[in-house]
Amino acid sequence: MEGIKQTFQRCKAQNRAALVTYVTAGFPHPEQTPDILLAMEKGGADVIELGVPFTDPIADGPTIQTANTIALQHGVTLQSTLQMVRDARQRGLKAPVMLMGYYNPLLSYGEERLLNDCKEAGVNGFIIVDLPPEEAVSFRQLCTRGGLSYVPLIAPATSDARMRVLCQLADSFIYVVSRQGVTGASGTLNANLPELLARVKKYSGNKPAAVGFGVSTHDHFTQVGAIADGVVVGSMIITTIQKAAKGEEVKAVQEYCSYLCGRNFEQSAHELNMGEALEAAKEPVGTATVDGVITEADIDAQLAALHGTIPKRFGEFGGQYVPEALMDCLSELEEGFNKIKDDPAFWEEYRSYYPWMGRPGQLHKAERLTEYAGGANIWLKREDLNHTGSHKINNALGQLLLARRLGKKKIIAETGAGQHGVATATVCAKFGMECTVFMGAEDVRRQALNVFRMKLLGAKVVAVEAGSRTLRDAVNEALRYWVVNLADTHYIIGSAIGPHPFPTIVRTFQSVIGNETKQQMLEKRGKLPDAVVACVGGGSNAVGMFYPFSNDPSVKLLGVEAGGDGVDTPRHSATLTAGSKGVLHGVRTYILQNQYGQIEDTHSISAGLDYPGVGPELSNWKDTERAKFVAATDAQAFEGFRLMSQLEGIIPALESSHGIWGALELAKTMKPDEDVVICLSGRGDKDVQSVADELPIIGPKIGWDLRF
């Protein structure tokens, strides 16, 4: 921390802005990183940000995403990143080094261990993109105790009230994001940057402010350096490395840094003359007095006051692990949701669309499935009969009505199987709102029918080629897009995932499933069901079915995840069955990750369940043992698909088929006078081609042959 402070003080004494440079650890190769750090310093860098690679860097543009991917392919971990710092220090690196990145790899490493190892390796502090101060209380305390810096970020969207608190938190400098959006070099600077910096300086006192995002040329450096204490350059350094001839990367970095700032190491590492030394050693004149002391507890209380009243956690799960640019937008969303959740006029409007949606939904006994299982009565809650063919319409309509009250004109969504995308495109068509749906390229391939349905409805469909090209990657791109377009765009997230208040919003609109089930079972059976069953991906239909029964201990809650090829293989999506606690897409929950906190690729025959995370409320129900979760393999899901089709004349979605298999297994263990309700979350016409494609492989496992 002190090293960073002294660096900014020295730059100020020399009447210049500090050059803060970024490179991803292990890019282009781990062996080159210490040389690149030294080259940055020789080229005039005053402070160095070393990026810790992560599989899902939602705040970064394509350039740094690529660098992360390459570093991970080289096997770079947090441990090896710290070794790179040690190696550079041993070879003479003097510049302060900040670790920059995302929280999950750090959380996986262990906060206390991380702080100790970082201090020993020669790291000076942290810039953690998705760890806002509200979520970093213990981490900040550890940093303070260890003399390491926690650098807050401020974005153009940050309100004055929030900015005031963030500036108080800063212990070395403040990182100012020059524009809304993701990282990346640009041809022009934000024209509103002087105004943004003026706002920052209003609250920052004498704390330095360094500006990043979009700086790429010497002119940019000069312009920003004239009004800021530091200038951050990252993406253009990655690009410089990419463009350099093999073996010339280190030299190219040094030359680029020198070009940016017009200086080099020889100019900046001069000996202090006697006058400078005496000036630096002077005692302050008079006795220093203070008018008050602001403690960490005071700051935490101020942060809490910026938020609404809805609890943002379910036990230890939930929270808002997002880039600073989203924080005030989420507060706006929470405030808007608070206004409508208990407003009779809103719910009257919502229910006025029931005839269009196909609600109230149907519930009936599955006679032949019951006979087949030979145990409890099996009932079907028919969300597949809703308009658009799934439960997704419940949430899409509710969030669109909320977005209109917030004054948003455009809607974005992510989708896996396409059902949420279709539901969102449908409500946007009805209300005349522009709609963009992000969908993994692999899901576009296997759900081509739903892609065409979305386009028929007037939506724009963006295929995401990054990563595993599935739902997780669609969420990443949707979040990146939203950060850029907060002013006029609402993100209708499709599952009970994401940062607070999204899990609560989605649960609220999906609870119509469980509320109707409870009422209908009382009418038909005069009692509550003994168990309710739902498939689980992100958890939207499960949380909607389970929540109304969560305080009824006589009702078992069973969630059925995607077991893929089996949870004893790497090819599954069974997050609650086989995952561990971590942070993904803005929320602390169970996730599928490796030992280094990197997110694992997943597999399911069902695109809608092919996701490495799950809603935080479901995670809490798992830990408190309120709900039980099991996994059904692809073959077992096919068995559920076949039985529902051939015994009840209902072709279910492959997602729902997982729940069907789990419910049948449960019903077999129960008494004939007991009742199990399955949430039949969607219809299966979208999956017929997938079943036909996979049947030659899976069919023999379950004795099912439909070849002509």
UniProtKB/Swiss-Prot annotation:
Classification via HAMAP family: Trp_synth_alpha (MF_00131), Trp_synth_beta (MF_00133)
Pathway: Amino-acid biosynthesis; L-tryptophan biosynthesis; L-tryptophan from chorismate: step 5/5
Ranges where the record places region Tryptophan synthase beta chain: 306-708
Active-site residues annotated for this sequence: E49, D60
EC number annotated for this UniProt entry: 4.2.1.20
N6-(pyridoxal phosphate)lysine carried by residues: K392
Keyword Lyase annotated: yes
Catalytic activity: (1S,2R)-1-C-(indol-3-yl)glycerol 3-phosphate + L-serine = D-glyceraldehyde 3-phosphate + L-tryptophan + H2O
Cofactor: pyridoxal 5'-phosphate
Keywords of the record: Amino-acid biosynthesis, Aromatic amino acid biosynthesis, Lyase, Pyridoxal phosphate, Tryptophan biosynthesis
Residue segments, region Tryptophan synthase alpha chain: 1-305
One Pfam family of this chain: PALP
A GO cellular component annotation in the UniProt record: cytoplasm
GO molecular function terms listed in the Swiss-Prot or TrEMBL record: tryptophan synthase activity
Protein name: Tryptophan synthase
Signal peptide start-end: none
NCBIfam families: trpA, trpB
GO biological process assignments: L-tryptophan biosynthetic process
Family in the record: In the N-terminal section; belongs to the TrpA family. In the C-terminal section; belongs to the TrpB family.
